[in-house]
Amino acid sequence: MTEAMKITLSTQPADARWGDKATYSINNDGITLHLNGKDDLGLIQRAARKIDGLGIKQVALTGEGWDIERCWAFWAGYKGPKGVRTVMWPDLDDAQRQELDNRLTIIDWVRDTINAPAEELGPEQLAQRAVDLLCSVACDSVTYRITKGEDLREQNYMGLHTVGRGSERPPVLLALDYNPTGDKDAPVYACLVGKGITFDSGGYSIKQSAFMDSMKSDMGGAATVTGALAFAITRGLNKRVKLFLCCADNLISGNAFKLGDIIRYRNGKNVEVMNTDAEGRLVLADGLIDASAQHPELIIDMATLTGAAKTALGNDYHALFSFDDTLAGRLLTSAAQENEPFWRLPLAEFHRNQLPSNFAELNNTGSAAYPAGASTAAGFLSHFVENYREGWLHIDCSATYRKAPVEQWAAGATGLGVRTIANLLTA
């Protein structure tokens, strides 16, 4: 058996022979990471990527200075989408070790689920994986309902049915109730709504291959809110929370939806489809209608919704939108506490009116006259939230997935956002 490479921490700079910018050095005892006191977590994560790039697949984190956040930063950079890596963790107290184990179980589940090929993870499989994860942490407190295919149309989930009907794999709505109180009449504290597009071709507004090749990850919002609920439960969540996952493929077929179609939603809104590649908001609308009907204190939806958010923030931050300044501030505080990157982008009342249609109340996409695509998408969603000015957060989760490796992340899913939402739920 190969001996694990020892990884130690030092606050001293590397020997000058390694260069004045060296973040790690190698010696007979192993590898030393040289912290600078400025961005130690980032330095550890980037160094872990380099260590993985050396082909080292077994490591032992030894010596002083390894706390849970430094351990987690190392794993965030060290984990990759293929191959097996083994880490011998340092001694942590019981609470930190339990927290680390929960992160390894749940956030790795999120990353692995997002990375799964679309052929292996259709709408039904995604919903079932979510159920299995949540049952593994709190099965006695979980009930759920799966509605799929033509049952969605019969129950007036017209956005989800319309988008998903073009695939041989039927669209699915997962409605899951986490109720630790044991009281079936207990108020719902929060609702989480996730976009679960298990593959997005763009439909008849078809994507180019360069934009389609990562679209197995278009269910990143659904995976992240599922992981967030599971993680919050491990941190002691004792309030009732409902989860709505809107799962579908967006494909081309003789039965697929078309430009010019009009979708009539249960809340009375009519939407003209002028871009079948703006499908995420169409499925989320159904989930938000259900969430609003619960009258919770808090609604959070999460979706890989727009390229505009990615243009603004890259893959480095999740974009946050809200009319509720106090609530937005609370989420940003949670993000800072969890060392996760969120950035608030504008959402104003006028964005709700920048989706004009000649044939319906709303268009599902903005025109060239209204180019703020991420903000108008959030404005669209607000039409399906009963009290949109209070208690609602929309997260356009552009940091869930990377098509190519960078200095701190392997290619694929990141798991970012799970800790922040869990923090907010348990604050």
UniProtKB/Swiss-Prot annotation:
Q: A Gene Ontology MF term for this entry?
A: metalloaminopeptidase activity
InterPro entries assigned to the protein according to its UniProt record, in alphabetical order: Leucine_aapep/pepB, M17_PepB-like_N, Pept_M17_PepB, Peptidase_M17_C
Q: Which GO terms describe its biological process?
A: proteolysis
Manner of cofactor binding, per the entry note: Binds 2 manganese ions per subunit.
Q: Which cofactor does it need?
A: Mn(2+)
Q: Which residues form the active site?
A: 207, 281
Positions with a binding annotation for Mn(2+) 2? 195, 200, 218, 279
* Domain of life where this protein originates: Bacteria
Leading EC class: hydrolase
Record's catalysed reaction(s)? Release of an N-terminal amino acid, Xaa, from a peptide or arylamide. Xaa is preferably Glu or Asp but may be other amino acids, including Leu, Met, His, Cys and Gln
Quote the EC number: 3.4.11.23
Keywords from the named record:
Aminopeptidase, Cytoplasm, Hydrolase, Manganese, Metal-binding, Protease
Intracellular or extracellular location(s): Cytoplasm
GO CC aspect terms = cytoplasm
Q: Where does Mn(2+) 1 bind?
A: 200, 277, 279
Q: Which SUPFAM superfamilies match?
A: Zn-dependent exopeptidases (SSF53187)
Q: Which PANTHER family match?
A: LEUCINE AMINOPEPTIDASE-RELATED, PEPTIDASE B
Q: How does it assemble?
A: Homohexamer.
Q: What does this protein do?
A: Probably plays an important role in intracellular peptide degradation.
Similarity field: Belongs to the peptidase M17 family.
Protein name, per record: Peptidase B
Q: Which organism is it from?
A: Salmonella dublin (strain CT_02021853)
